[in-house]
Amino acid sequence: MYRILVVEDDEVIAKTIRQHLQSWNYEVFAVADFNSVMEEFARVKPHLVLMDIRLPFHNGFYWCTEIRKVSKLPIIFVSSMNDNMNLVMAINMGGDDFIIKPFDLNVLTVKIQAMLRRTYEFAGESPVSYTHLRA
């Protein structure tokens, strides 16, 4: 079962995401102490992180950079900060995708599924071969 860490300070959004993803059989953990995101990350050992940008103490860009020091797992930013500069910063700081709030839970789910599939299920496959194709 895949583990997902939700770093979101809006309790309603965090609870909604957690309940929805649990219905898809994901193990979901929500950070409660925003001074201890890395401790929670080490404890949970997630396969994927959902990261808000505006957080107490340190923003999501900071935590993404800290996670990138120790892991290459997928990080999807989920934020209402929908201007292009925040999207560019999120990806440049190590994020893999960006979803703008408000969002459809089904869109979030398929993005998570695709990210997990590419990261973990296809990881053992050899690179694509084009030798059988003719021009």
What is the predicted function of each stretch?
Residues M1-F122:
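N-terminal/domain-start alpha-helical segments
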Residues E121-Y130:
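Short, basic/polar amphipathic helix motif occurring as a linker/hinge flanking DNA-binding modules
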Residues T131-A135:
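Conserved small/polar residues in nucleotide/adenosyl-binding loops
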